[in-house]
């Protein structure tokens, strides 16, 4: 399994390994102080408030999963079983399934790391069901 954000030290769970409510590279939510007002955010070094606001666009979170199968035929069967499942949040989470030899490759792209995490978890549940079903019925017969 390979996470593109892991190269920079973060992941889909919030980036800092704590599994908190913030997304690395995304919008962090901060708790309001006792007075009730949210904390003010100062622009970074050499930036004024206007350029900080323009530069606050989030980079998309990208997650790629490579699933090896014993044979290319089994990878194709899994692809055929999993590809028809539409993504519930199609506007904010993109999911692309491809097969390369005996490897099923799934690539997600999302603006919101929480929706990305939900999509990956749901996919892993479906993948688990497909793999267990394939194991129960035995190796496929060549077409």
Curated annotation (Swiss-Prot):
Q: Which first-to-last residue range defines the signal peptide? A: none
Q: What is its main location?
A: cytoplasm
Q: Which UniProt keywords apply?
A: Cytoplasm, Disease variant, Epilepsy, Intellectual disability, Nucleus, tRNA processing
One GO term (biological process): tRNA threonylcarbamoyladenosine metabolic process
Bias (Low complexity) occurs at 30-55
Disordered: annotated segments: 1-57
List locations, semicolon-separated: Cytoplasm; Nucleus
Expressed, tissue-wise, as follows:
Ubiquitous.
InterPro entries from the xrefs? CTAG/Pcc1
Q: Name one GO cellular component term.
A: nuclear body
Top-level taxon: Eukaryota
Q: Name the family.
A: Belongs to the CTAG/PCC1 family.
Summary of subunit composition and partner proteins: Component of the EKC/KEOPS complex composed of at least GON7, TP53RK, TPRKB, OSGEP and LAGE3; the whole complex dimerizes.
Purpose of the protein: Component of the EKC/KEOPS complex that is required for the formation of a threonylcarbamoyl group on adenosine at position 37 (t(6)A37) in tRNAs that read codons beginning with adenine. The complex is probably involved in the transfer of the threonylcarbamoyl moiety of threonylcarbamoyl-AMP (TC-AMP) to the N6 group of A37. LAGE3 functions as a dimerization module for the complex.
Pathological condition linked to this protein in its record:
Galloway-Mowat syndrome 2, X-linked: A form of Galloway-Mowat syndrome, a severe renal-neurological disease characterized by early-onset nephrotic syndrome associated with microcephaly, central nervous system abnormalities, developmental delays, and a propensity for seizures. Brain anomalies include gyration defects ranging from lissencephaly to pachygyria and polymicrogyria, and cerebellar hypoplasia. Most patients show facial dysmorphism characterized by a small, narrow forehead, large/floppy ears, deep-set eyes, hypertelorism and micrognathia.
What name does the UniProt record give this protein?
A: EKC/KEOPS complex subunit LAGE3
């Amino acid at each position: 399994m390979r996470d593109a954000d892991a190269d920079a030290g973060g992941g889909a769970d919030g980036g800092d390994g704590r599994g908190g409510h913030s997304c690395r590279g995304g919008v962090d939510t901060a708790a309001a102080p006792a007075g009730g007002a949210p904390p003010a955010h100062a622009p970074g070094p050499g930036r004024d408030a206007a350029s900080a606001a323009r530069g606050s666009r989030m980079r998309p979170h990208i997650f790629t999963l490579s699933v090896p199968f014993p044979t290319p035929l089994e990878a194709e069967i899994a692809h055929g079983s999993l590809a028809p499942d539409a993504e519930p949040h199609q506007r904010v989470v993109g999911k692309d399934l491809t097969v390369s030899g005996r490897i099923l490759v799934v690539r997600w792209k999302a603006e919101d790391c929480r929706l990305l995490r939900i999509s990956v978890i749901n996919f892993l549940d479906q993948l688990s069901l497909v793999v267990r079903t394939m194991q129960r019925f035995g190796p496929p017969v060549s077409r």
